[in-house]
From Swiss-Prot:
Subunit and partners: Interacts with H3K4me3 and to a lesser extent with H3K4me2. Component of a mSin3A-like complex at least consisting of SIN3A, HDAC1, HDAC2, RBBP4/RbAp48, RBBP7/RbAp46, SAP30 and ING2.
Presence of the UniProt keyword Electron transport in the record: no
Annotated crosslink Glycyl lysine isopeptide (Lys-Gly) (interchain with G-Cter in SUMO1) location: K196
Coiled-coil residue windows: 49-101
Protein name in UniProt: Inhibitor of growth protein 2
Name of the gene: Ing2
Length: 281
């Protein structure tokens, strides 16, 4: 008799659990359908706004080209000044449109991420208790760590005069400032050469043999890229690129700071004279 009562209790408990899971499943499906149905409309609205901004941006670029062509052909100084101001306003407008496009794309990305996160939270209701507990612990650990922002930073607005010089590239008032493209290329080269020098200037990372010969002005072992002095009697012979301020091997002859004359392509006269005397003997 007792066994039958226990079985009935188990059956009723199982029925309650099944009913609860069915209710949760029904809620999940309903939320999922609402999310899936509304997401395309929200994305389409953002895409439409993005397309409108892009059309305005293309029109502004065309306006910039037209005004710049007129500026190059204009001889009157007053008219050139008016065209320059017109060009300046168009450049500012183009940058603002670009910033708005970036903001719309960021909103679209956040919209998709929020919907995915919402569905993931709902799906945890159907996991086993042990799995649900592990997922909860994992989410707590993730929340305790510094959160990485997925938001793309807005581009900083530069000054109007720098924007103008960046696009016109030949206007009288901005001739002393190099074009942005050239500045960016120069900055990239400097960054690459600096990183390369930092890598070459750190021989500590290598396992150094105490009996290994040393070179260069720094009296360190051979590592990284090195260049040889063209003076046959040079006491040091080899030099690290970073120690002699080189980023690439120069063409022709090269002399180290101890052996060079007026420049790195010529040898010191006193050193050359001593060399000739030795040959005469």
């Amino acid at each position: 008799m007792l066994g039958q009562q226990q079985q009935q209790q188990l059956y009723s408990s199982a029925a309650l659990l099944t009913g609860e899971r069915s209710r949760l499943l029904s809620c999940y499906v309903q939320d999922y359908l609402e999310c899936v149905e509304s997401l395309p409309h929200d994305m389409q609205r953002n895409v439409s706004v993005l397309r409108e901004l892009d059309n305005k941006y293309q029109e502004t670029l065309k306006e910039i080209d037209d005004v710049y062509e007129k500026y190059k052909k204009e001889d009157d100084s007053n008219q050139k000044k008016r065209l320059q101001q017109h060009l300046q306003r168009a450049l500012i407008n183009s940058q603002e449109l670009g910033d708005e496009k970036i903001q719309i794309v960021t909103q679209m990305l956040e919209l998709v991420e929020n919907r995915a996160r919402q569905m993931e939270l709902h799906s945890q209701c159907f996991q086993d208790p042990a799995e649900s507990e592990r997922a909860s612990d994992k989410s707590k650990m993730d929340s305790s760590q510094p959160e990485r922002s997925s938001r793309r930073p807005r581009r900083q607005r530069t000054s109007e005069s720098r924007d103008l010089c960046h696009m016109t590239n030949g206007i009288d008032d901005c001739d002393d400032q190099p074009p942005k493209e050239k500045r960016s290329k120069s900055a990239k080269k400097k960054k690459r050469s600096k990183a390369k020098q930092e890598r070459e200037a750190s021989p500590v990372e290598f396992a150094i043999d105490p009996n290994e010969p040393t070179y260069c002005l720094c009296n360190q072992v051979s590592y990284g890229e090195m260049i040889g002095c063209d003076n046959e009697q040079c006491p040091i012979e080899w030099f690290h690129f970073s120690c002699v301020s080189l980023t690439y091997k120069p063409k022709g002859k090269w002399y180290c700071p101890k052996c060079r004359g007026d420049n790195e392509k010529t040898m010191d006269k006193s050193t050359e004279k001593t060399k000739k005397e030795r040959r005469a003997r």
